[in-house]
């Protein structure tokens, strides 16, 4: 019996580590969803200009593209698999005329980003190119995809770390939009 237990020990240890990693991925030890960590810029003004340094052949992301309207800023890259997963959700969200959706293309080649958008569709009204990640640092990004809901005054109202899903929209982004708009979002 001791021989079999010893043989199963690595499997049991691996299972425990995998389960713990899954729990950490889903939530921290305080029961909070870590995908909704506040941005370092929360409730401060957001500056889009650094991402406009190099532009693709799409409308450029500037401060004017963000301020004055409720805007979702999505940080993505063509090489990011979770970005591909969330793309259909963003395309559907782009149909809501009350929300402006713009992007920061993170550490990517412009040609690759254009191919990505050509293949999957373009939900963005403007795109900033961030080849070295400086704009992402300015925004407080630490992994992509990330999305920021920015109020009409330029204040970050909500941050989503990881791919947006229908569930995350319902539980996080939509309530933040409703609060910003002062009315229910259908």
Curated annotation (Swiss-Prot):
Name of the featured protein: Thiol:disulfide interchange protein CycY
One GO process term, biological-process aspect: cytochrome complex assembly
Domain of life: Bacteria
Function: Required for disulfide bond formation in some periplasmic proteins. Also acts as a disulfide oxidoreductase in cytochromes c biogenesis. The cysteines of apocytochromes c must be in the reduced state for covalent linkage between the two moieties to occur.
Domain called Thioredoxin: residue spans: 47-182
Disulfide bond sites: 80-83
Keywords, alphabetical: Cytochrome c-type biogenesis, Disulfide bond, Periplasm, Redox-active center, Signal
Subcellular location: Periplasm
GO CC terms of this entry: outer membrane-bounded periplasmic space
Signal sequence range: 1-20
Gene name tied to this protein: cycY
InterPro entries for this protein: Periplasmic_diS_OxRdtase_DsbE (IPR004799), Redoxin (IPR013740), Thioredoxin-like_sf (IPR036249), Thioredoxin_CS (IPR017937), Thioredoxin_domain (IPR013766), Thioredoxin_ResA/DsbE_sf (IPR050553)
